[in-house]
Amino acid sequence: MRLEDLRPTPGSMKKRKRVGRGPGSGHGKTSGRGHKGQKARGTGKVHPWFEGGQTPLQRRLPKRGFKNINKKVYAVVNVKVLEEKFEANEEVTPAKLLERKIVKDMKDGIKILGDGELTKPLIVKAHAFSKSALEKIESVGGKAEVI
């Protein structure tokens, strides 16, 4: 084998497409764009949501509802999590919940929900409570304070 015998692997060197260079090139005259029409033009891009001139789907469907700018978004914590992570008579505050990574972030505060059972009394300070959570906290001798 000599240096002049070396050739690139078949299929690795793709020939450049030279458009508009006569009929013999296979891409002459219209350069592979067909005859006239939007896609034959210089900036003939058709957006994916274009439906050929008919009224698009997002305009055919009615507008519904709205976003309530005053909506409160609470980080939720269930009673069963408090049972696992806190000792009896311990104070549960939003700062402690963040510190122990029980909640990631508080947008408008913390809401305690009533899923699970509670067996030890806790002093829970949160921004909101569900009815079942309030009952469970107070039934075991704990206190629920809205802050």
UniProtKB/Swiss-Prot annotation:
| A Pfam family it matches | Ribosomal_L27A
The name on file for this protein is Large ribosomal subunit protein uL15
Biased composition, class Basic residues, residue ranges: 30-44
Tell me which GO cellular component terms the UniProt record holds.
cytosolic large ribosomal subunit
Q: Which of UniProt's keywords are assigned here?
A: Ribonucleoprotein, Ribosomal protein, RNA-binding, rRNA-binding
According to its UniProt entry, the function of this protein is described as: Binds to the 23S rRNA.
Listed SUPFAM superfamilies: Ribosomal proteins L15p and L18e
Q: How does it assemble?
A: Part of the 50S ribosomal subunit.
State the Gene Ontology BP annotations. translation
**Example of a GO MF term:** structural constituent of ribosome
What is the superkingdom listed in this entry's lineage?
Answer: Bacteria
Which family is it part of? Belongs to the universal ribosomal protein uL15 family.
Q: Positions of the region Disordered?
A: 1-57
